Amino acid sequence: LYNGPYILKSFTSKSSIEMTKNENYWDKDKVYVSDVKLEFYDGQDQSKLAKSFGENALSLAKLFPTGSGYSEQAKEFKDEITYTPQDAASYVIGTNIDRQSYKHTAKKTDEEKQSTKKALLNKDFRQAISFAFNREAYAAQLNGKDGASKIIRNLYIPPTFVQADGKTFGEMVKTQLDTYGDEWKSTKLDDGQNGLFDAKKAKEEFAKAKTALEAEGVKFPIHIDMPVDQTTPSRVQRVQSFKQSVEEALGKENVVIDIQMLSKEDLQNVTLFAPNAAGEDWDLSDNVGWSPDYQDPSTYMDILKASSGENTKTFLGFDPSENNEAAKKVGLYDF
């Protein structure tokens, strides 16, 4: 295998990938690095990357501000620490609106399963979760308090991704969003700020949802399964932060986030690598993201089309079709 200037020399699963210069490459005189080695990092030892960087074994390394060794690393590398600018990749929390698998769950009865499903199909309930989510506290588990705002995104499609008629995409969305209800009028969609978190609004939206759901026979608290890679401390910390902010805002008597600690392989198999929606074994998942293929908002939206989107199972827990009842319930065929 080769990619032009380099030939694959070796590939060892969960260890390393090595490439060497391709002497038959047409422009080989401009390939100045003869050998490239990519090392696998499983996220467990948060001091490993900084140590390797200090030993000149890595040309760059990620630091973990919440790790136990960060204070010493900050002193040692203070003149070399930078924050990576936000790009067009967006990472979100997916909502499984049509869950079928319950191998990894805290739910004990079919009644609990149905109550959670009905809750996630309720717009006011989903909005309550969104307003209860402290994105800054969540981001701080990865970037530290000082760097948390640098990775916050409040829109799935970046607000400055495109412009039209002198307005950014975010400004155009905000104009429409304000017409959906008073709860949205004070929100801010710009990157780099905690523009959706509002515990008061979360409580108000939840109160509306609870009234409607109790009329449907839903029992509280709603138990929400959220899987995480148990071997990666920063990922566990983020999910714990999400749990804390949601339960504090809405009350444990109303909503409980049940963290499902899984191996990396099990997590991948019930999220991204699940062969179909029947294998998507979760209620909410932060193992979801997308990078654009071209400069148009449709590159983000087409993958979520209810009838044909390639990623409806990963983001929303259902296989694309013309007649999914859950997708109908939340209005996905209306767009």
PLM ranges: what are they?
Residues 1:
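Surface-exposed ligand-recognition segments of extracellular binding domains, strongest
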Residues 5-142, 163-335:
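Extracytoplasmic/periplasmic ligand-capture domains
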Residues 98, 152-153:
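Glycine-rich, flexible loop/turn motifs
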Residues 153, 157-162:
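Surface-exposed loop and adjacent secondary-structure segments within mature catalytic domains
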